[in-house]
Regions:
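Basic/polar N-terminal segments that are highly enriched at the extreme N-terminus
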Residues: 1-4, 283-285
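Short acidic, glycine/proline-enriched helix-loop-strand junctions
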Residues: 235-238, 281-285
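Cys/His-rich Zn2+-binding cysteine-cluster or related metal-binding knuckle/ribbon modules and their
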Residues: 247
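Acidic/glycine-rich phosphate/pyrophosphate-binding loops and surrounding catalytic core
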Residues: 2-211, 215, 224-232, 238-242, ...
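Structured adenosyl-cofactor binding patch, chiefly the S-adenosyl-L-methionine
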Residues: 271-283
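C-terminal active-site rim and adjoining tail of enzyme catalytic domains
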Residues: 220
């Protein structure tokens, strides 16, 4: 899926990641690779999947050596097979080897997110439900992981605690109930702020609907119970299914008629896609 990633501020993040990895110096590369030598490396997939993170890989190599020639063969969103060539990097051999791990870490992780998202999004494609992520992201990586979700064909839930309200069970307990929580949220929020509330049963649905929730999250309900709730809500609020959604249950959830299906596993426990880098002949100065 075609989407865009803002690289604003990414240079600082990449420098921090490189500092974490390199420390005072890449002692293995410094010891084994002659200074001034050059090479050409090929980055390629070893498993089928959806590509994400090419621009980040380029930024990693350019942070180490701006003169490196990074040529992207594929763009983010490309469907890869087990032999797809993603990019080539030419130039200083020490810089290429030093940047290998970080660039691959980013490509593997983000492509893993995009691939898993694509797999689930394809399952519910015949239905109206939209697949979205959650805030269950890796600290410091949220905007990148949420970008990868978009690349894979999903959409983003709220970006953080600041752009939408989601009243969960603990908020409801502290506030004194569903109606009280929604009343307080509505009094606090601006007119542009959407308010979502989590409910666990039909009584909660009816109370949330009467109290004016914009979005009602059906938490850990069976598909049959979700379908009953959808009928009661009757388009008066957006309906989200959440909690325990898996590859085995997502189609049933979509068939229930919900508008949105949120899956934390898109980001919190995704398997990295196998991507590798092969070094060509080393040419000494």
């Amino acid at each position: 899926m075609k989407t865009s990633l803002s690289l604003f501020g990414i240079e600082d993040e990449i420098k921090q990641w490189l500092k974490e990895d390199i420390g005072s110096g890449d002692i293995t590369t410094l010891a084994t690779v002659p200074a001034g030598s050059t090479t050409r490396a090929i980055i390629h997939a070893k498993k089928p999947g959806i590509l994400a993170g090419v621009d980040l890989a380029r930024e990693v190599f350019h942070a180490l050596d701006p003169s490196l020639k990074f040529t992207a063969i594929l763009e983010d969103g490309a469907e890869m097979d087990a032999t797809s060539v993603i990019a080539t990097v030419e130039g200083d051999a020490q810089a290429i080897l030093t940047g290998e791990r970080l660039s691959l870490n980013l490509l593997q992780h983000l492509s893993g997110v995009a691939t898993r998202t694509h797999q689930l999004a394809e399952l519910i494609k015949p239905y109206r439900a939209k697949l979205v992520d959650t805030r269950k992201t890796t600290p410091g990586m949220r905007r990148l992981e949420k970008y990868a979700v978009r690349v894979g064909g999903g959409a983003n839930h709220r970006l953080g605690l600041y752009d939408a309200m989601l009243i969960k069970d603990n908020h409801i307990k502290v506030a004194g109930g569903i109606t009280a929580a929604l009343d307080r949220a509505r009094a606090y929020a601006g007119h542009m702020t959407k308010i979502e509330i989590e409910v666990e049963n039909m009584d909660g649905v009816k109370e949330a609907l009467a109290a004016g929730a914009d979005v009602i999250m059906l938490d850990n309900m069976s598909a049959d119970r979700m379908a009953e709730c959808v009928k009661v809500i009757d388009h008066k609020a957006v309906v989200e299914a959440s909690g325990g959604i898996t590859e085995e249950t997502i189609v049933a959830a979509a068939k229930s008629g919900v508008d949105v299906i949120s899956v934390g596993a898109l980001t919190h426990s995704v398997k990295a896609l196998d991507i590798s880098m092969d070094i060509g002949e080393i040419k000494t100065a």
